[in-house]
Amino acid sequence: MMMMSGRPSGGAGGGRYPFTASQWQELEHQALIYKYMASGTPIPSDLILPLRRSFLLDSALATSPSLAFPPQPSLGWGCFGMGFGRKAEDPEPGRCRRTDGKKWRCSKEAYPDSKYCEKHMHRGKNRSRKPVEMSLATPPPPSSSATSAASNTSAGVAPTTTTTSSPAPSYSRPAPHDAAPYQALYGGPYAAATARTPAAAAYHAQVSPFHLQLDTTHPHPPPSYYSMDHKEYAYGHATKEVHGEHAFFSDGTEREHHHAAAGHGQWQFKQLGMEPKQSTTPLFPGAGYGHTAASPYAIDLSKEDDDEKERRQQQQQQQQQHCFLLGADLRLEKPAGHDHAAAAQKPLRHFFDEWPHEKNSKGSWMGLEGETQLSMSIPMAANDLPITTTSRYHNDD
């Protein structure tokens, strides 16, 4: 080269370096271009422009030596004189450019038309993501109504699933054979409810306006008398939603229907954990839930003779007894010789009773008119001692 032969005294005078600084830079520049040529990759234009300028400068120096001062050839090298704001060129163009940001660099050859090797070429592109298109294309699962109907048909049980045509979401009611876990607690009504016809089940499931609210927590639909308009007893339906709560409390609708047939008498709820003396006696007494009812909410409205009605009316008028329950002095009227008669007529040990309710009076469930008096008595009966907790309604005469 021309610069290699010109002015060697700068480095040769000391006998240490055979080339000057500018000559060494030119050699590095030419070696970098040779690497690009050997790897078969196109040479960047930044490496070619300094060669053109140096060629023009050398030709100018040959014609007019005055242009050699000041030393301008050192300013013409691309990566040093022109590219101050640019990145340094790759010293090894055919090598994979994957680095760790420090000294390490991949030693493999770069893939054709790429900066990286086959191992590092697709890094960071194919992430593990869930295919959204596949989840959207899957068909929706069959509805609960169709599944319940199919299972009932295969099991040989008449399907009683009902759905609503309103825009609200549909609810389905389990089949009667799904009520097996409840038979241990509720007894007769559930055991007898499995023998219902499909027509009767469909009727009870359609006439009730509270169908959507109650079917979700109870295996059987509410009875047909829920379709009546009971404005003052609307609170009673909310308590029915709690599982098993109707074994202790009842709503005003049941009381009113019972008093329509039984007058001012009281009716008893089912016992919990006790067994009747006779196997033929239903779990619910005659004045409570009917064991042949189509729903656990149904009440056995059997007709009682006139003597029974008069006896119950006299019982309410003659009862008077003091009892301390929960630290309060609560008073209840009770006849003296009624304990043995009640124990003989009602062999079940009832846990909760309910006060009689007048049909024409305004109900007092949540602290309305009237007073509520409770008493606990331990009558001395012929059999083992039944403990009865009675909740009655006291009417001011």
UniProtKB/Swiss-Prot annotation:
Coiled coil regions, renumbered to chain: none
Keywords attached to this entry: Activator, Nucleus, Transcription, Transcription regulation
Low complexity composition-biased segments: 144-174
Keyword DNA-binding recorded: no
UniProt cross-references to SMART domains, sorted A to Z: QLQ (SM00951)
Matching Pfam families: QLQ (PF08880), WRC (PF08879)
Domain WRC per the UniProt entry, residue ranges: 90-134
Residue ranges constituting the QLQ domain according to the UniProt record: 18-53
Motif placement: Bipartite nuclear localization signal: 86-105, 123-130
Region (Disordered): 117-176
Keyword field contains Repeat: no
Biased composition (Basic residues): 120-129
PANTHER family: GROWTH-REGULATING FACTOR 5, GROWTH-REGULATING FACTOR 6
Record's function text: Transcription activator that plays a regulatory role in gibberellin-induced stem elongation.
Domain-level remarks: The QLQ domain and WRC domain may be involved in protein-protein interaction and DNA-binding, respectively.
Protein name listed in UniProt: Growth-regulating factor 1
Species in which this protein is naturally found: Oryza sativa subsp. japonica
